[in-house]
């Protein structure tokens, strides 16, 4: 079971890094449609993180 927990933890860390990158990208762009897409991606990624945390 520890192996799965480790994998979940690694995936959570990866997703958290993706969120940070997308947040930085939002700060660098002025294009509203790009911002909207990134914000939706961030929301969905955070939902995935919350689901994965249930297994850690």
What residue spans do the PLM features occupy?
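A short hydrophobic/aromatic micro-motif that marks alpha-helical segments and, especially, helix-coil
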Residues: 31, 45-46
């Amino acid at each position: 079971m520890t192996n799965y927990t480790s994998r979940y933890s690694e995936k959570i860390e990866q997703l958290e890094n993706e969120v940070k990158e997308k947040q930085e990208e939002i700060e660098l762009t002025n294009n509203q449609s790009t911002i909207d897409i990134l914000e939706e991606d961030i929301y969905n990624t955070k939902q995935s993180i919350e689901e994965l945390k249930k297994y850690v």
